[in-house]
């Protein structure tokens, strides 16, 4: 009787111990505190932490979040609005951060090209460290998810590289995402190419998954250039971008004339006609 009772107690102790240990480890991920996100659709102010100049009129601006352990909370492929009062009038401009929530805790970064007659871009260029900007978001109809397409073709011009770079980085940093990416990136001159070292590093690390064609409007006399010259043509798109299919998507971002031309060529190649306002599932999406 005592033996049976002792065996029963031992069995109960082992069972309870197993349940406790199993619950502790299997629930470890669930018990981790949720990541703090910052964006909430309301206007918020963020201070400029650093400014990294890339060209004579382009820089990466890093803004701090109110909490050092928080992230911006922006879905990949979406953008934020920046507000500023210029000559007594409120102006708005949308930008896609180049940073990802997965690797930017306590801050976010914007790639901005400033124009002499620009509004928000000029305001950003004149910011001093510690100055604040007003931001609201998330905004946009695109939200990238891993493996949503087998292939993604991208056409970008100038700072239109921002959403493409964000998506490429997200794919590159996720070993489970097997999406193949082909990017055609156009600029006026060689010095205007933005984020080239970062882009080239990802291509070098995963050449079978990422391919980039750089295009320029012109090169200086005697300057070496291994890319293409001129405008993005039907032949360029046919050769360097995925063919239209249900498993492929074409993303566009850049100067309006370039985007309009790419939309027309895409139709001639067999892609669906781009809609006036692009949605996530469109075969051709213009940011």
From Swiss-Prot:
The keyword Mitochondrion applies. The lineage of its organism: Eukaryota, Fungi, Dikarya, Ascomycota, Saccharomycotina. It comes from Eremothecium gossypii (strain ATCC 10895 / CBS 109.51 / FGSC 9923 / NRRL Y-1056). It catalyses: 2 Fe(III)-[cytochrome b5] + NADH = 2 Fe(II)-[cytochrome b5] + NAD(+) + H(+); 2 Fe(3+)-[Dph3] + NADH = 2 Fe(2+)-[Dph3] + NAD(+) + H(+). Its cofactor is FAD. FAD binds at residues 125-142, 151-183. This is NADH-cytochrome b5 reductase 1. It comes from the Eukaryota. One of its GO terms (cellular component) is mitochondrial outer membrane. The gene is CBR1. The keyword NAD applies.
């Amino acid at each position: 009787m005592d033996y049976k009772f002792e065996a029963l107690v031992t069995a109960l102790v082992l069972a309870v111990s197993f349940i406790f240990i199993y619950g502790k480890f299997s629930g470890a991920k669930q018990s981790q505190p949720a990541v703090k996100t910052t964006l909430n659709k309301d206007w918020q102010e963020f201070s400029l932490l650093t400014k990294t100049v890339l060209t004579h009129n382009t820089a990466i601006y890093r803004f701090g979040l109110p909490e050092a352990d928080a992230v911006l909370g922006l879905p990949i492929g979406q953008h934020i609005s920046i507000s500023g009062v210029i000559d007594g009038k409120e102006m708005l401009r949308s930008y896609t951060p180049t940073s990802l929530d997965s690797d930017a805790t306590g801050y976010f970064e914007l790639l901005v090209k400033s124009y002499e007659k620009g509004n928000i871009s000029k305001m950003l260029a004149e910011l001093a460290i510690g100055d604040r900007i007003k931001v609201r978001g998330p905004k946009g109809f695109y939200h990238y998810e891993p493996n949503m397409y087998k292939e993604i073709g991208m056409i970008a011009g100038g700072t239109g590289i921002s959403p493409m770079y964000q998506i490429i980085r997200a794919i590159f940093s996720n070993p489970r995402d097997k999406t193949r990416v082909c990017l055609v990136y156009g600029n006026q001159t060689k010095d205007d190419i933005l984020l080239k070292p970062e882009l080239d590093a990802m291509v070098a690390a995963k050449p079978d998954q990422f391919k980039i064609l750089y295009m320029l409007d012109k090169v200086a006399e005697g300057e070496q250039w291994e890319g293409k010259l001129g405008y993005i043509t039907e032949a360029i798109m046919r050769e360097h971008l995925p063919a239209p299919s249900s498993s492929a998507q074409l993303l566009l971002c850049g100067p309006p004339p370039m985007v309009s031309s790419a939309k027309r060529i895409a139709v001639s190649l067999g892609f669906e006609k781009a809609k006036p306002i692009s949605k996530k599932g469109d075969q051709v999406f213009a940011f």
